[in-house]
Amino acid sequence: MVGLVDALGGGPAVIAGHDWGAPVAWHAALLRPDRFRAVIGLSVPYRPRGSVRPSTAMPQTADAIFYQLYFQAPGVAETELSRDVRSSIRRILFSGSGEGRRAHAGLGNPAAVGMVPRGGGFLRHTAEPATPPPWLTEADVEFYAGEFSRAGFRGGLNWYRNIDRNWELMAPYAGARVTVPALYVAGDQDLVVHFRGMDQLLPNLKKFVPELRGTIMLPGCGHWTQQERPKEVNDATLA
């Protein structure tokens, strides 16, 4: 990120990130406040370094495991997602959206809390939309499917496989706080905000991000914050 800022003129910059991009943005601001004057996290809030390896704290039961644990074994998720790349993309995008969450409300399946059934798969409790949501075009699906068909899913999944290593590398920063001005934006239907521990982290986020200027929860919005609600996200980031 520092190299990108250098290439674009030197900054200091405002950095924003969504999903895995959010920890990248939060930690860029944490580590280099001289190069990043503000930070915006979408979906994933800043989470201070815990006292145990992240993978050891992830939930699992006799029937299901947390999806990030499912992603750990090389080749397993890649094989599942690559069987039909276009269908996988449609299922993931729809099931994570506000529309998808409403369509599957009350089903009571393990996916409701980010769990993957043992002996099943990540896509088992997903479905392709009968009608795509208005923010998702077939051109979008074709582009994403083309890129994943070309490059595969391993690069993205390796982010999950590196969680414990990143935790090790951040040991010198245990207890560190993000000190630059910050904003957190998420949808109230985003599964991320319903993960275990979020009910304690989100109300106390300002303890770890003292210059947090606001937490914005978008009603009815799912995981794909900036796709589902582009105007609201743009308005919030420019305010």
Where are these regions (language model features)?
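Flexible "cap/lid" subdomain of the alpha/beta-hydrolase fold that forms the substrate-access gate
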Residues: 1-16, 20-213
